[in-house]
Design a protein with these regions (language model features):
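Short, polar/acidic, helix-capping and beta-turn segments at strand->helix junctions
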Residues: 25-163
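Short, Lys/Arg-enriched N-terminal segments with co-localized hydrophobic residues
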Residues: 9-24
Length: 163
């Protein structure tokens, strides 16, 4: 007669296999070329061909201090920080498919747009811009991005099927 262990051992085997698969699906990205995280989060996380970049504020990567000055300088610093995170995974702004911009003053929208456009020269990604009451360390702008690796986003053609 064989002992009856029930389903419990099977459940643990499946659970452990699932946890291992999840761990293999997520890669944490960190580069010294961008500011270190100022909280319990990563600069970016990659799952398959998707890269999720945490919001960047205008911190100098070397000093960790906020870049002072006008919204133009802050926006450039933020986008340069994002470029460094993308570069850590051999990606560029051409790989970005979605951005979210957080501004403390929508009066800065036009200036941010002009600078943003100089980084996204062709086929700009989908984007949301929202005004918030405050950002960490007194920043005036924060931007987060989602990027696709391996050129996946440019290999698909969309067709209008409405008519």
């Amino acid at each position: 007669m064989t002992p009856d262990f029930g389903v419990a051992p099977f459940v643990f085997v499946v659970r452990d296999a699932f946890r291992a698969k999840l761990a293999a699906m997520k890669k944490i990205i960190s580069t010294s070329e961008a500011p270190a995280a100022i909280g319990p989060y990563s600069q970016a996380a990659r799952s398959g061909n998707l890269l999720f970049c945490s919001g960047q504020i205008p911190l100098d990567p070397k000093s960790g201090q906020i870049v002072t000055g006008d919204i133009g300088g802050q926006t450039r610093r933020v986008l340069d920080n994002i470029a460094a995170v993308l570069k850590a995974e051999a990606l560029t702004f051409d790989n970005v498919v979605k951005t979210t911009i957080f501004l403390t003053d929508l009066g800065d929208f036009q200036t941010v747009n002009e600078i943003y456009g100089s980084y996204f020269k062709q086929a700009p990604p989908a984007r949301s811009t929202v005004q918030v009451s405050a950002l960490p360390k007194g920043a005036n702008v924060e931007i987060e991005v989602i990027a696709v690796a391996n050129g996946e986003s440019s290999e698909t053609t969309a067709y209008d099927t409405s008519g």
